[in-house]
């Protein structure tokens, strides 16, 4: 057994995984239990009181985290005319129409976000089989189908997180990196949870946010005591 495995085993022996942890304790334990050399992401899983089998209770939205998520975001923009220069100035890595579509078909996906102006959607929809499974299809709700290209690119670059529930009514997202200061993680978490609250379907009854678990890429998952959060 190597040193990292021994250290992780020792750490796990002192963690009660059935306990609801104070948010400060949760972050401290996640940082303490990180044994890998790379900068792990801090991920959140939220169990919601929704019926995912009913379309009117499914959630799909986005929010901009104040401290970003700790990595650079590559943006592809489908647009034309004057918007090409605007997209370039805003920092988009890939810009085009039919030419960009052909590039994606031949070379695959090497970007994190797709933004499109309404007039470009006729081209983007043809990429549904490529973009759809990766949750990259532009969407008006998410602000990725827009006439304000500059703002959409800025949001994507500065920490916009797009989320949707899975078939079990759970939302998964990244809210930061293990090297973030504790207050930065808490600020991101609070903004993310506020967005989740605003996205609550009117048809959802009973307890809405049932359970919150924070984890790292290769580390442990800890349940958070919601009474210690700014909910």
Swiss-Prot record:
Protein keywords: Repressor, Ribonucleoprotein, Ribosomal protein, RNA-binding, rRNA-binding, Translation regulation, tRNA-binding
Give one Pfam family: Ribosomal_L1
Q: Which GO terms describe its molecular function?
A: rRNA binding; structural constituent of ribosome; tRNA binding
- SUPFAM superfamilies tied to this protein: Ribosomal protein L1
A Gene Ontology term for the protein's cellular component: cytosolic large ribosomal subunit
The family database entries (InterPro entries) matched by this protein are listed as: Ribosom_uL1_bac-type, Ribosomal_uL1, Ribosomal_uL1-like, Ribosomal_uL1/biogenesis, Ribosomal_uL1_3-a/b-sand, Ribosomal_uL1_CS
Q: Does the keyword Protein biosynthesis apply?
A: no
One GO term of the biological process aspect: translation
Instruction: State how it assembles.
Output: Part of the 50S ribosomal subunit.
**PANTHER family, per the entry:** 54S RIBOSOMAL PROTEIN L1, MITOCHONDRIAL, LARGE RIBOSOMAL SUBUNIT PROTEIN UL1M
Protein's name in the database: Large ribosomal subunit protein uL1
Lineage start: Bacteria, Pseudomonadati, Pseudomonadota, Gammaproteobacteria, Enterobacterales
Gene name as annotated: rplA
């Amino acid at each position: 057994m190597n040193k990292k495995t021994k250290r992780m085993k020792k750490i796990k022996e002192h963690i009660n995984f059935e306990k609801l942890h104070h948010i400060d304790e949760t972050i401290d334990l996640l940082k303490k239990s990180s044994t890998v050399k790379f900068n792990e992401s801090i991920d959140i899983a939220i169990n919601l009181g929704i019926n995912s089998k009913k379309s009117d209770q499914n959630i799909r939205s986005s929010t901009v985290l104040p401290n970003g998520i700790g990595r650079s975001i590559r943006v592809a923009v489908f647009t034309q005319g004057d918007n090409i220069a605007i997209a370039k100035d805003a920092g988009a890595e890939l810009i085009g129409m039919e030419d960009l579509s052909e590039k994606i078909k031949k070379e695959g996906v090497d970007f994190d976000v797709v933004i499109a102006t309404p007039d470009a959607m006729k081209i983007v929809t043809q990429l549904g089989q490529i973009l759809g499974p990766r949750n990259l299809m532009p969407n008006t709700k998410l602000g990725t189908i827009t006439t304000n290209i500059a703002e959409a690119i800025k949001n994507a670059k500065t920490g916009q997180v797009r989320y949707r529930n899975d078939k079990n009514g759970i939302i998964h997202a990244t809210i930061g990196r293990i090297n973030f200061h504790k207050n930065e993680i808490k600020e991101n978490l609070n903004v993310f949870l506020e967005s989740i609250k605003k996205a609550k379907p009117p048809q959802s009854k009973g307890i809405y946010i049932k359970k919150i678990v924070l984890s790292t890429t290769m580390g442990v998952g800890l349940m958070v005591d919601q009474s210690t959060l700014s909910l």
